[in-house]
């Protein structure tokens, strides 16, 4: 939806970490987004990314004032290696429990064996954070999306992530499973019913992470706090999925 930068090697896409809002921090790279949530009783990390960029993620965690040992849970939104490639190594480093949607566990096994399998409606509670998961298949069969609340300056914001927005697996030759197109559209429609104040992407081009982060650092203006970003992105995903289906019959 926003500008996508490509690098010959994924580890070249280094980004400076920053606090998005409340307890939510970006510690990822151009290649794949990684977020941490400071729950007060340890960190929840979302999508460690590529194994080749794990050193960037760990460095960013330190820069934000935390340590890998603070991580209690590693949430994986879907099984693809650009999000889960570093899960096994990071879990070994910090001792965290790993989570993934139950329908992605088998394919994720080439990267790691999950400690906790997520079902629709499951809630992960740690400290002041309650993270709710919805099964949103399409990109993969076991994709999960997630929602939680965070506070800043006396205001409460609902944070949301679409766990698998990519349309690349909606092309016939790259289908993750049968009926993925129908599932994807149903997932988008379901997510449109969720109220989200702060949309975090699992890739930086989903929500303009780089540009909004620079604005936040330089001016203090927080463009991440905008409910229209969520609905606009989901509408974009719907149109793109329909277009793929029409051109790839």
Locate predicted features.
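Short Gly/Pro-enriched turn/cap motifs at secondary-structure boundaries
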Residues: 15-16, 25-27, 113-116, 135-139
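Short, flexible loop segments at the rims of nucleotide/cofactor-binding pockets, characterized by
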Residues: 22-26, 74-77, 175-180
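Structural recognition of the beta-strand scaffold that forms the well-ordered cores
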Residues: 26, 44-46, 73-76, 97-101, ...
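Metallo-beta-lactamase
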Residues: 43, 50-52, 123-125, 130-228, ...
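Active-site HxH/HxHxD metal-binding segment of metal-dependent hydrolases
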Residues: 50-55, 61-123, 224-226, 230-233
């Amino acid at each position: 939806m926003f500008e996508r930068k490509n690098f010959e090697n994924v580890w070249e896409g280094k980004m400076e970490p920053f606090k998005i809002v409340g307890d939510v921090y970006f510690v990822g790279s151009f290649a794949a987004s990684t977020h941490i949530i400071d729950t007060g009783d340890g960190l929840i990390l979302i999508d460690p990314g590529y194994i080749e960029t794990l050193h960037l993620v760990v460095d960013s965690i330190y820069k934000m004032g935390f340590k890998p040992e603070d991580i209690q849970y590693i949430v994986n939104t879907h099984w693809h290696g650009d999000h889960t490639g570093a899960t096994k190594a990071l879990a070994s480093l910090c001792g965290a429990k790993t989570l993934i949607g139950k329908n992605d566990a088998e394919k994720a096994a080439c990267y790691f064996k999950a400690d906790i399998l997520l079902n629709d409606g499951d809630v992960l509670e740690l400290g002041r954070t309650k993270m709710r998961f919805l099964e949103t298949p399409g990109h993969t069969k076991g994709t999960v999306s997630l929602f939680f609340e965070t506070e800043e300056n006396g205001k409460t914001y609902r944070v949301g992530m679409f766990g698998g927005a990519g349309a690349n697996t909606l092309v016939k030759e790259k289908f993750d499973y049968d009926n993925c197109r129908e599932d994807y559209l149903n997932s988008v429609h379901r997510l449109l019913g969720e109220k989200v104040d702060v949309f975090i992407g699992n890739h930086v081009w989903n929500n303009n992470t780089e540009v909004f982060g620079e604005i936040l650092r330089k001016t203090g203006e927080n463009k991440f706090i905008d409910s229209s970003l969520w609905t606009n992105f989901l509408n974009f995903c719907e149109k793109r999925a329909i277009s793929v289906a029409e051109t790839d019959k």
